[in-house]
Every structure is written in C-alpha cells, then in structure tokens.
C-alpha cells in the first residue's frame, strides 16, 4: 500500500505492508521539493525511516523496501540516503545493508518533580546579572508574523550551528513562509508552542529555545531546539534560557511530569547543561547514510 503526502516544501511518501488488514511494516521517506528554500544544497538527500513488527522480522520485509528506496532516489536524482535506528535489530540491518554510521544521539528526559528548583532560580539570576544588556523575550505562542522577516534568517543561522558529526547534509533555510507552514501544522495537531530567546543590544538574537505541549500527551513537554550563537557562548546564556523555560513551563503546565529533548552525543556543552538539570538518557539512536550506487549494488544482489 502506498500513501502520498505532498507537503508544501517536501514530498513525503509512506508505504505500508499489510497482513490480513494488519499493518506489519511501514516506510516513510522525505525529499526537498524543487523550488523550496534550501533546495540547491538538499536536493540530493533522501531521508527515510521504516520499521517491521517483531513477529514479522527475518522474513525479507525490510529487504523488500530497498528497491522502493532506490526507485525514489533515481526519480528525484538523490545520491545519498539517510536512515536511522533506535533498536539493535535496526542497527544490525543497516550494518548488513552497508550503510555507514554517521551520527549518534539520544532522546533525553527530565523528570520535573526531581528538579533542583533552587539551582534553576540561581541560573536565571546569574543569566540576568551576567548579561545585563541582553533582553529576554518570551512568546507563549508562535513568533508573531510581523517579526518573521527579521527572525527567520537569525533562526536559520542558529539551526546551522547544530553538530552534524559525519553526516553529509545541506543547509537549513528557515524562511517566513517555511515557519508559517510549520506553525500551521502545529496548530492542526493542537500543539501549544512556546519560545524564549535572548536579544543583544544590536538586535542580534544570541540564543533561543522552544517547546511544545500536546493535549494528547499532557504529561510530556517536547523541547525542540536550543542554541546559542558561537560568539555569545561562555556567558551562561544556554543555562539562562533552559532554566527560564523550565520554570515557565512548570507554571503553565503544572501537571506535566517530563521534558523530552534530543541531543547529539557530540554536543558536549548542551549535554553538560542537561546533565546538571537532571536530564537522563531515555533512548539511544544513530543515523546512517549510504550512497545510491552502494544501495543499487545491494538491491542487485537480492535478485
């Protein structure tokens, strides 16, 4: 079964393997659409994720997805396939495939009832005192539309400071149109979006963090992105942002018990902040990449 979701800036394909009306495997792919922001540097990358139910593994279902992936890569002119796994069978499959492990990371979770609130308040005070001319801005909704022209390029710059490890990748380009589309999707899902950022006297956004809360899982807050400009690091801005956001979310969502966030294992500064706050590893994973030609060799060997 094949499902197609034609998003505004990406082409999404979803495939399902069904046994007696029961979905036993799924495959999802994404590729940047021609004309989308960042297309020139992202056009050659196809991203995918798939899974097979445990009782149906080792029957060739995972291998059956490979010709589909090759067909999609050829159709869109992609030369690199990016995959991921959070389970040992998945890592073993990707090793068999010949994909190279390029980045490792984890979902880390903070149990809010165990937070050291005295430390959190101290970090907030230290942030204010350490950067007295830096303004903290709080948005308990999306960034206002009137600010997107100014916000989008600075947000893009922050996003592109994320550690990529050995992953081949394009440039992240967040335009006002891209952000509006993302906000529309959040609204359709019923998400509540919150952003805290720091702005320097010259108007430059030196750091930011944002979080979503979902009514269908009210106990868990999802921290999406936290970043500080390289030229603003060493001033405690990351701790200030994380502490302020945590304190605010605890007040707005007193019944929430967890904050979940994802971090690359190589992101030492952010992991150090998270560890002091009480974040603990919940689920480990890795990203892999394989070239189109190497995938084709594996597909030919299956015939």
Segments the model singles out, each with a brief description of its role:
Residues 28-80:
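Long, hydrophobic/aromatic-enriched structural stretches that serve as scaffold segments
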Residues 148, 152-155, 182-183, 242:
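Hydrophobic alpha-helical core bundles mediating ligand binding, dimerization, or RNAP-core interactions
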Residues 207-209, 222, 235, 240-242, ...:
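Conserved N-terminal glycine/acidic-rich loop preference
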Residues 34, 84-85, 100-114, 275-293:
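Conserved catalytic-core motifs of GNAT/GCN5-like acyltransferases
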Residues 73-86, 249-262:
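Conserved GNAT acetyl-CoA-binding A-motif
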Residues 115-149, 164-166, 296-303:
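Conserved N-terminal entry element of GNAT/NAT acetyltransferase domains
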Residues 1-15, 19-20, 25-39, 159-220, ...:
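A conserved beta-strand-loop-helix scaffold within acyl/acetyltransferase catalytic domains
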Residues 52, 58-74, 92, 96, ...:
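Conserved acetyl-CoA-binding loop-helix of GNAT-fold acetyltransferases
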